[in-house]
Structures are given as C-alpha cells and as structure tokens.
Amino acid sequence: MNDELINSKENIMLAYTYIEHGKFELLEKPKPEIRDSRDAIVRVTLGSICTSDLHIKHGSVPRAIPGITVGHEMVGIVEEVGSDVTLVKPGDRVTVNVETFCGECFFCRKGYVNNCTDPNGGWALGCRIDGGQAEYVQVPYADKGLNCIPDTVSDEQALFVGDVLATGFWAARISEISEDDT
C-alpha cells in the first residue's frame, strides 16, 4: 500500500452524522484539527445519546445543520491542544461540557453560558458544529469546556457530568434557588 493512501486513512474517522429530517448515517469524515488557539482535540472514549440528538433526528431543532456530527455527551482523552489552552494537556482524561462558551461576553460573565454570543456558543456541539458521536471531536474554548477526570472515576461515571448532572445543577443555579426554598 502506498504512503499516500495510508496517510489519508490516518486522517479519517467514523462519525454519526445528521443527514436530513429523520435520517442519521455513520460516515467517514476527516479527523478534526485545531482551528483556533483555544481549541482542543479529544479522542472520544465513551459517549451517550441524548434526547436532544433524537430531537434533531425528528426535526425539532431547526438550527441543527445537516451534515453535522451529532452528540454532546462524551468523555475522552485530550490528543492535542491549541497554544492558548492552559488547563488541560494531551493525555488528560476529560469530560466535555454540553455548552460551548467564550467566558468573555455579557451572558457568559453573568453565568448564562447557554446564551454565549460567540458563533460557536451555547448548544453548538452536535447541533451547529461537529459533536462527539465520533472517534474525535474538536472542542472550542477548551479551558472552559473540558474538565479533567480523577483517576478514581471511571469514564462511565464521568459521562453524566458534562450534560445530565450539569443541566440540573445549572438550572437550579440560574433559578436562584436557595437552601431555604421549598
């Protein structure tokens, strides 16, 4: 086999892709690359299907872009980081946050990261930018969206931190519920 063919396959991955209303397919796609100095590339080790993925399939998410790799519930190992990423490094096991956010805009500074004004902000992974139902995922704002997993926590245990647990915690926080509320 020639080197060109081998190298081209090394840059290809499998990705579960939203094709059109009612249709997903497992496709070969190029592996993601660092596009911004704040990005990280994560090799996905475990992911789950969220109800939001099913909403995309059934046409309930008009902002979902056909051709996008779905999925925003995943854990993995950092493969590569951009030059401005300081909180994670290659080899770290991480959870990936459901929300992508800059941390700098008005909404992020107020804690409403779902309304981040960055084009890749809010629920972007698996909806408007390629998500984690793939072998690899490019994570914008890696220092905001990746959290290291302690060695005592399995991938399966950590999987619920990025969306399932975080969504309930965040909803309670922005609702300004206090300990005295019933």
What is each residue range found by the language model?
Residues M13, R38, D92, D180-T182:
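Nucleotide donor/acceptor-binding cores
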Residues I19, K31-P32, I65-G71, L125-D130, ...:
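Short Gly/Pro-enriched turn/cap motifs at secondary-structure boundaries
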